[in-house]
């Protein structure tokens, strides 16, 4: 997965060679946050959305031609000034930041999409994901969701924080893939993720869909 920030041109190139490209709605077209307070009229706001669409659609076309999937990965800490000025630093703003791009994907009939919404604040992360599921259902969208808590830390604290955020959503039946992020060796993250998934899988009504490696996948 190519993780691209700040430069949509890099995302275009990455889509030619990578199986999946992650973009961050907060800095894909909107400039980096400067914490500037600016009120947008509805007309001005619509113009900004049009700029996103004009830049995002060519990227989707490259992905279509090369069978490249994308992940729309929203970070609580990198919401654009435009979103923050209209919605504040809220779950509603986080969700709208994601939906702006999802609506374009739906309009362009592009569905090789995975979504992630991450925050170091587990309350914000859980509320945002629950709200996103509600809004997607209203708009007839159904995309896989990737769960994770950023900056969870290490040791017992990091494991508890990950369990609170990811576990709460899995218990709701929300989430298709998970990533536990610890400030430790990457191998230490895997047992924690497996334990969470196994625990939820044992609960009544939470049947897991087992993952299988693609036959032609080269693990090297």
Label for each model-derived stretch:
Residues 42-52, 84-220:
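Catalytic alpha/beta core domains of metabolic enzymes, predominantly
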Residues 1-101:
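Active-site beta->alpha loop and helix N-cap motifs at the rims of alpha/beta catalytic domains
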């Amino acid at each position: 997965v190519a993780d691209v920030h700040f430069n949509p041109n890099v995302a275009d190139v990455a889509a030619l060679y990578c199986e999946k490209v992650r973009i961050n709605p907060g800095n894909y077209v909107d400039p980096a946050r400067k914490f500037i307070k600016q009120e947008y009229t509805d007309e001005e706001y619509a113009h900004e959305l049009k700029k996103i669409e004009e830049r995002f659609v060519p990227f989707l076309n490259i992905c279509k031609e090369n069978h490249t999937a994308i992940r729309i990965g929203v970070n609580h800490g990198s919401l654009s000034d435009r979103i923050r000025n209209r919605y504040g630093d809220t779950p509603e703003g986080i969700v709208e930041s994601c939906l702006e791009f999802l609506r374009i994907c739906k309009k362009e009939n592009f569905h090789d999409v995975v979504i992630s919404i991450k925050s170091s604040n587990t309350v914000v992360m859980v509320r945002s994901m629950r709200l996103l599921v509600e809004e997607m259902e209203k708009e007839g969208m159904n995309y896989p969701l990737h769960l994770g808590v950023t900056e969870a830390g290490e040791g017992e604290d990091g494991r508890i924080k990950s369990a609170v955020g990811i576990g709460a959503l899995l218990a709701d039946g929300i989430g298709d893939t998970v990533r536990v992020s610890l400030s430790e060796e990457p191998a230490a993250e895997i047992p924690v993720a497996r334990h969470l998934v196994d625990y939820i899988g044992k609960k009544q009504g939470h049947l897991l869909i087992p993952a299988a490696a693609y036959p032609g996948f080269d693990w090297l």
